[in-house]
Regions:
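N-terminal anchoring/stem segment of glycosyltransferases
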Residues: 2-94, 117, 170-171, 291-308
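Short catalytic/ligand-binding loop motif for oxyanion handling, primarily in non-cytosolic enzymes
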Residues: 62-64, 133-136, 141, 158-160
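Surface-exposed cleft-lining segments at the edges of enzyme active sites
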Residues: 95-101
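GT-A fold catalytic core of metal-dependent nucleotide-sugar glycosyltransferases
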Residues: 104-150
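Short beta-strand-to-loop element that shapes/binds the nucleotide-sugar donor at the catalytic cleft/hinge
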Residues: 149-170
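Catalytic core and acceptor-binding pocket of nucleotide-sugar-dependent glycosyltransferases
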Residues: 177-308
Length: 308
């Protein structure tokens, strides 16, 4: 918290007119276990324009002193809570991925809830450890209290939303937890995932139910009023920005093949823009999501290929 206050004071010194807006500043959070070099490179880039809370295990503690706008919080502060342990006891894995991997994805939201409560924050912008921010999130004009990516294309039981770039408040967490309980504990809403469970099981198709399924259901069932960050968003000056779903996939707001694509990745234009080939519009880029095998591209040299 001391590092955050220092960061805020620095902003005032650099730009006194920002003082009235300090309380509206949106902090970022990453939850990760086990050191990976790409996480270090992410923090170096993302923390240039954003204050980042890093919730992780002992292997990540050194990163909190390496970057001035990064504050490390030991994950044990949240992971060992009685409530989290109780929720884990109710979890059943309906996915071809491992139990531990899928549970941790769910647990992130439970931990964010407790983090917001303990640190008395109104909201936080969650980013995955392989998702780099190129802009100051606080400069964006969010239209709703909660905002994340929900692909327009939901065919073949995709049922997917993503908070790899997600504005989250306590209400989001509480409604996610309630939906989790209705599906996994009292099973009053198990029917919402039953067809998808059967689809993957009977057709022997990899994947299944995950935290992303519940993000999708929160929106589809109108449990939560959300802004879909799959679509363009403006900053305070009126410039249009867009969030990337996956660096290795050209899917965007206008379909599966929206963005200009070269070889195996979305084309980055002028170091921080992308081009929608369907709408024929160029957008400022909010993020780059190095999902899956693309993580190897987030290396010590990548920062020289972009502007942030």
């Amino acid at each position: 918290m001391i590092k955050l206050l220092t960061y805020l004071i620095g902003l005032v010194d650099l730009a006194p007119h920002l003082y009235d807006n300090l309380k509206k500043m949106i902090n970022c959070v990453i939850i990760h276990k086990g050191y990976q070099p790409y996480l270090k490179y992410n923090l170096e880039i993302s923390s240039k324009n954003n204050y980042v809370y890093l919730i992780g295990d002992d292997s990540l503690e050194f990163l909190g002193s390496k970057f001035k706008n990064v504050e490390f919080i030991n994950i044990q502060k949240f992971e060992n809570s009685k409530n989290l342990i109780h929720l884990k006891e109710q979890f059943k894995n309906f996915n071809s991925n491992s139990y531990d991997f899928e549970w941790f994805c769910f647990a992130r939201v439970f931990m964010i809830h407790d983090f917001l409560e303990q640190y008395e924050l109104e909201n936080v912008f969650h980013i995955d450890s392989d998702n780099v921010l190129l802009t100051n999130i606080s400069n964006l004009e969010f239209l709703k209290k909660n905002a994340y990516l929900i692909p327009p294309n939901q065919e073949a039981y995709r049922m997917s939303g993503s908070i790899h770039s997600g504005l989250i408040d306590k209400s989001f967490c509480e409604k996610f937890i309630n939906l989790y309980k209705d599906i996994y504990v009292n099973k009053s809403k198990f029917h919402l995932i039953e067809d998808k469970v059967n689809y993957h099981t009977e057709q022997n198709i990899p994947g299944g139910i995950c935290d992303m399924t519940l993000y999708y259901l929160l929106q589809r069932e109108e449990i939560l009023d959300t802004q879909n960050l799959f679509f363009p968003i403006k900053d305070k000056s009126g410039s249009e920005f867009i969030f990337m779903n996956n660096f290795s996939n050209s899917e965007g707001p206008n379909g599966k093949n929206s963005f200009q694509f070269e070889k195996d990745q979305i084309s980055i234009i002028n170091r921080n823009k992308i081009f929608d080939t369907i709408s024929e519009k160029e957008y400022n880029l909010c993020n780059i999501h190095f999902q899956g095998g693309a993580k190897k591209k987030l290396n010590r040299l990548f920062k020289y290929k972009i502007s942030y």
